[in-house]
């Protein structure tokens, strides 16, 4: 038994995902996933806003193999704060098949950054979703960005669409490649031609260093249908958004499962059916190759490209 009690109502990851009908291209990368603990080995951070179920590296890599991915990018989960040990352990245990994205504080030493790099970390995540993290001053984040730029790392940013105007100047001043999580969480009820989503497309159009993950339809969808019970046309309301980004910026998009799907309230998707969502947003083999192989390899394994 874990020493940690899960947040009431917590949804555990889907235990027996289906085998995807969509065959992933060889070398496909799950470019956004997490590990949680296990809490008895890697305790959750005291300042966390939620307490998850355990989701171990072994379970993550079993899912990788089941779905047909070759590699993973393991993103530091907010429940671990700036204690990157669980993520680093997952990367080190992957036989070179995983890279990491860390959360760091201003106090981190150059030697500690180098240790993260040697473990496979290639980016840091700045989270602006207020319900998930406490505020960090922007000057501190900019200082961190300047330091990690020297290692060739990038910055991953997580924010809500409504906050893009106030964050614009900060984001556009970052000295690295910038990767947006989940298309900046658009409100899909406003439609793909909304002013809100137009601003996000402008952000990408005007800044060639900005990439986007076209992931997490299960978080963004309002009308579904859900990726459950064999549903092959899940999350129709999200498709136009992701497809627009993939087709306009084919060389700057990534995709990931977001396993084990932290903080979902409505339902827990079947990860096999999430993979079957991909051809709806990247309809050609060429777009699928860029989204799933070429782009993540260029960003995370450039030495192999």
From Swiss-Prot:
EC number: 3.1.1.57
Gene: pmdD
Keyword Hydrolase applies: yes
pH-activity profile: Optimum pH is 8.4-8.8 for the hydrolysis of 2-pyrone-4,6-dicarboxylate.
Positions that bind substrate: 32-34, 50, 78, 125, 131, 158, 182, 263
Function, in words: Involved in the degradation of aromatic compounds via the protocatechuate 4,5-cleavage pathway. Catalyzes the hydrolysis of 2-pyrone-4,6-dicarboxylate (PDC) to oxalomesaconate (OMA). Also catalyzes the reverse reaction.
Active site: 258 (proton acceptor)
Record family assignment: Belongs to the metallo-dependent hydrolases superfamily. PDC hydrolase family.
CDD domains in alphabetical order: PDC_hydrolase (cd01311)
Keyword Iron-sulfur in record: no
Descriptive protein name: 2-pyrone-4,6-dicarbaxylate hydrolase
Gene Ontology biological process terms, A to Z: 3,4-dihydroxybenzoate catabolic process
Regulation of protein activity: Strongly inhibited by 1 mM Zn(2+), Cu(2+), Mn(2+) and Co(2+) ions. Also inhibited by 5,5'-dithiobis(2-nitrobenzoic acid) (Ellman reagent) in vitro.
Disulfide bonds listed in the record: none
GO MF: 2-pyrone-4,6-dicarboxylate lactonase activity
Phenotype seen when the gene is deleted: Disruption of this gene results in a strain unable to grow on protocatechuate and a variety of aromatic substrates funnelled through this compound (m- and p-hydroxybenzoate, p-sulfobenzoate, phthalate, isophthalate, terephthalate, vanillate, isovanillate and veratrate). Growth on benzoate and o-aminobenzoate (anthranilate) is not affected in the mutant strain, indicating that these substrates are metabolized via a different lower pathway.
Pfam families recorded: Amidohydro_2 (PF04909)
Entry keywords, A to Z: Aromatic hydrocarbons catabolism, Hydrolase
